[in-house]
Amino acid sequence: EPSRRQRQMCIRDSYYTTLFQQANTFSLGYNMNYDFIGQLRDYGVGFFGQYPFSKFSRFDFGATIRNVDYEIRQFDIFSFETSTNYKENLRAVVPLTSFVFDNSTNGYTGPVDGFKQYLTFQFSPDIGSNSIPFQTLKFDMRKYYKINRNYSLAARLMLGKSVGDKPQKFFLGGNSQMMIFSDTQTEGRDDSGFYAQRVLDYDNTSILEDVYFSEYVFPLRGARYRERVGENVAVANFEFRFPFVNYVDVSFPARIRFGNIFGHLFVDVGAAWDSSEEFDNSELVRNKYGLSDPKASPILTTFGIGTKIFTPFALIRIDTAWDKYPSGGYSKPQYIISFGYDW
C-alpha cells in the first residue's frame, strides 16, 4: 500500500494532452496584375506533465509534434483565377524539460514577495529534410522584495542561448500584449509600428522559423518587437511598484468614483546577438539593422514610469518610456498601452 507521501504526490502530479490547428491568411501586397496572399497553418499534438518535488518546486516536461505550412498564392485581378507560386513545410518534434522553483506571494497586480526560477531545455532533433534541428537553454529568475503592504521592489534576469543546424532566434523588444504603441524614435528619427522588422513579408525567406520556432523576449518597454534579434539573449528588468491613486470621489458635475490605480518605475536593459563580435564591432550591428550610429550596439536600455488600472475586462497598463542612445541622449517619450499582470 502506498505511503501517505506517495498518495499526496500522485494527487498532485498532473498530465494533459492538447490537439491544435491554427490557420492565418494575410495580404502580401499587390501589383498591376495580381494580389499576393500568404497562408500559414500550424497543426499537431502536445503531451505535457508536472512532477512536484515540494510545495515550491516541480519538474515540468513534455513534447510537441507539429507541422507548419506556408503558401503564397497569387490572385489574377482580371481572370479571377488563383494559383500557388510558393510552398514550404517544416516538421518538428520538440521535447522540453523545465525545473521550476516558486515561493512568491501575489498582491493585487502580481507578485510582491519571494523568488521565482525557471531553467528550461528544449530541442528539436533532425528528423529529415524538412526538420529544424536546434537545442535551446533558457534561465529566468525573479526576485521580489516587499517593503510594506503597498510598496515592493522587483528584479529579473533572463538568459537564453540556442545552437544547432537551425538555431532558434530570440526577438527582443516590446511588451506583452501591446494594444497601442505611439510613434517611436530610432537614433533620433521618428518611426512607427509595433515591429522594427516585419515578419509577414513577401521577401522573408525564414517566415516559418520566425513565426513558429522563435521566441519573443520582453519586457523592453520603449523598444519595438524585434528591435534586436539573435541566437543569444540577455535581459534584466528592475521595477519599483507603488500605489498611485487610492480613491477619488467626485460629486460635480457628475458623481464619479474610481481608485486602486497602481504605479511603477522601471528600467529595462537587454541584448540579443548572433556573434560576440557584435559587441566590439559596431559595423556588424549597423549592417544587421540598417543603423547609422557609429556606436550602434546589440544592447538596448529603456526606462520610464507607468500605471495599472483595473477594468471589468482586464488590468490595463499605461507606460511612458524613453530609449537611451548609444552615443548619448534620449528619445522622446513613447506611450504604450497593454494589458496583463506584473511579471
Where are each of the predicted segments found?
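Single conserved hydrophobic/aromatic residue that forms the stacking wall/gate
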Residues: 1-7, 11
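Transmembrane beta-barrel architecture of outer-membrane proteins
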Residues: 6, 42-44, 92-96, 114, ...
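Transmembrane beta-barrel wall of Gram-negative outer-membrane proteins
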Residues: 13, 32-74, 82-84
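C-terminal outer-membrane beta-barrel translocator/porin domains of Gram-negative envelope proteins
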Residues: 17-25, 31-35, 83-88, 92-260, ...
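Membrane-spanning beta-strand positions in outer-membrane beta-barrel proteins
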Residues: 58-60, 152-154, 315-317
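Outer-membrane beta-barrel "beta-signal"
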Residues: 96-99, 309, 332-343
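A generic beta-sheet turn/junction motif
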Residues: 148, 309-313
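Short basic (Lys/Arg) and small-residue
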Residues: 268
